[in-house]
UniProtKB/Swiss-Prot annotation:
Family from the record: Belongs to the BsuBI/PstI type II restriction endonuclease family.
Needed co-factor(s): Mg(2+)
Gene3D superfamilies for this protein: 3.40.1350.80, BsuBI/PstI restriction endonuclease-like
UniProt-listed GO biological process terms: DNA restriction-modification system
Oligomeric form and interacting partners: Homodimer.
Top-level class of the enzyme under EC nomenclature: hydrolase
Organism of derivation: Providencia stuartii
Superkingdom classification of source: Bacteria
InterPro entries assigned: BsuBI/PstI_C_sf, BsuBI/PstI_N, BsuBI/PstI_N_sf, Restrct_endonuc_II_BsuBI_C
Keywords tagged on the record: Endonuclease, Hydrolase, Magnesium, Nuclease, Restriction system
Gene Ontology MF term list: DNA binding; magnesium ion binding; type II site-specific deoxyribonuclease activity
Entry protein name: Type II restriction enzyme PstI
Length: 326
C-alpha cells in the first residue's frame, strides 16, 4: 500500500502540471504528509494541517518508513515546498502570513482547492477540477502575491529609491538602520551599498535587495557572499568611512572573532571602516553586551538619538587597534 500511495501522489502532482523534478518520490512523500494520508487511508480523508518541515519529515518517517536525515530539511524546503508554493498547491503560514521568513514557526498547508481535488481522486471528477485549477492559477497567484505584499516592509533609500523587504523583525531593523541611524550618524553624503533580505539567505524568493558591487570594488572591497557581508553596508562619501552594520535580532553582534573575520576579508579596503552593531531594544543589547568587540559602536533602534561606544580614544570613526580576544 505504501508504494501504491506514493504512485498515486506522483500521478496527482504530474496532473497538476509540475515538472518531473517536482513529481519525484520526495515530492510524492511530501504531498502525502501535507494531506495527512497514511498508507491505508482513502484520499477522501485528506486534510490540511499546518506543518513545519520537520513535521513533514517525521510523518514520512513514521508512516512510510522513508527516513530523511536532518540535513535533508533544506532540500525538502527549497526543492519541493518552495515549488509547491509557487504552483499554488500550498500556502505558507496560513495562520499568520506576516510571519518572518526565517521564523522557526514557518509552516506549510494544502489550500482548499487542492483538498477538493484530492477528495475526488481517483474515481471522482478530479481531472476536471485540476483543469479548472490550472485555468485559474495565474489569478490565484496574483491574489496570493498581493496578500504577501501587504506585509512587506517598505524602505526609502538615501537616494530616494523605494524597495521593500520580506516581513520579520530582522528586516524591520534593517529599515530602522536606513531610516533612523543613517540620517543621524552617517549624514546626507551616505550611500547604501548593500542591504540583504532574510528571504534571500533562505533561498525563498528574496534577493540581495541592494548590492552595488562596482562601488564596493572601487573601495577595495572584494566580492563577498551575503553570509559574509554584514547586514547593511553604508559609505559616507564626505568622511570616506565605510559603515559595516550588523543587525542583531537572533544571531550575534560584532564580536572580537567576527571583527577579525571582517578585517581579514576587508584587508584590501582603502577607506576607514566603522563597525556598528544595531539592536532593536535595550533588552536585546543587554543579552549580547558581553560579546561585543572593543573599538566598535552600538546603536539601539528604540533610542535612536544615542550610541554606545565600545572604545576609549574617540567618539565615532575607524580604528587601527585590534580588539582584545577574550
Amino acid at each position: 500500500m505504501k508504494e501504491l500511495k506514493l504512485k498515486e501522489a506522483k500521478e496527482i502532482l504530474k496532473a497538476l502540471g509540475l515538472p518531473p523534478q517536482q513529481y519525484n518520490d520526495r515530492s510524492g512523500w511530501v504531498l502525502l504528509a501535507l494531506a495527512n494520508i497514511k498508507p491505508e487511508d482513502s484520499w477522501k480523508e485528506a486534510k490540511a494541517p499546518l506543518l513545519p518541515t520537520v513535521s513533514i519529515m517525521e510523518f514520512i518517517r513514521t508512516e512510510y518508513g522513508k527516513d530523511y536525515k536532518p540535513n535533508s530539511r533544506e532540500t525538502i524546503r527549497r526543492q519541493t515546498l518552495h515549488q509547491f508554493e509557487q504552483a499554488r498547491i500550498v500556502d505558507r503560514n496560513r495562520d499568520l502570513p506576516s510571519r518572518a521568513t526565517n521564523s522557526k514557526d514557518n509552516n506549510y498547508s494544502l489550500n482548499q482547492v487542492i483538498i477538493d481535488i484530492l477528495h475526488n481522486y481517483p474515481n471522482g471528477n478530479w481531472k476536471e477540477l485540476i483543469q479548472q485549477f490550472l485555468t485559474h492559477v495565474p489569478s490565484l497567484q496574483e491574489l496570493y502575491e498581493r496578500a504577501l505584499a501587504r506585509d512587506r516592509i517598505p524602505i526609502k533609500l538615501l537616494d530616494g529609491t523605494q524597495i521593500s523587504l520580506s516581513p520579520g523583525e530582522h528586516n524591520q531593523l534593517h529599515a530602522d538602520i536606513v531610516h533612523e541611524f543613517c540620517p543621524r550618524f552617517v549624514g546626507d553624503m551616505g550611500k547604501i551599498l548593500y542591504i540583504g533580505d532574510t528571504a534571500s539567505s533562505r533561498n525563498e524568493g528574496g534577493k540581495l535587495m541592494v548590492l552595488d558591487s562596482e562601488y564596493l570594488k572601487k573601495l577595495g572591497v572584494p566580492p563577498m557572499s551575503h553570509d559574509k557581508l554584514p547586514d547593511v553596508v553604508v559609505y559616507d562619501e564626505k568622511r570616506k568611512w565605510l559603515f559595516l552594520i550588523e543587525a542583531v535580532t537572533s544571531h550575534g553582534p560584532i564580536s572580537p572573532k567576527r571583527w577579525l573575520e571582517l578585517e581579514a576579508a576587508l584587508s584590501s579596503c582603502t577607506v576607514g571602516k566603522v563597525y556598528v552593531t544595531a539592536f532593536p531594544t535595550r533588552t536585546e543589547f543587554r543579552k549580547n553586551a558581553a560579546n561585543i568587540a572593543w573599538e566598535t559602536e552600538v546603536w539601539i533602534a528604540d533610542n535612536p538619538d544615542h550610541m554606545v561606544h565600545f572604545n576609549g580614544d574617540r567618539f565615532l570613526g575607524p580604528h587601527d587597534k585590534k580588539p582584545e580576544l577574550s
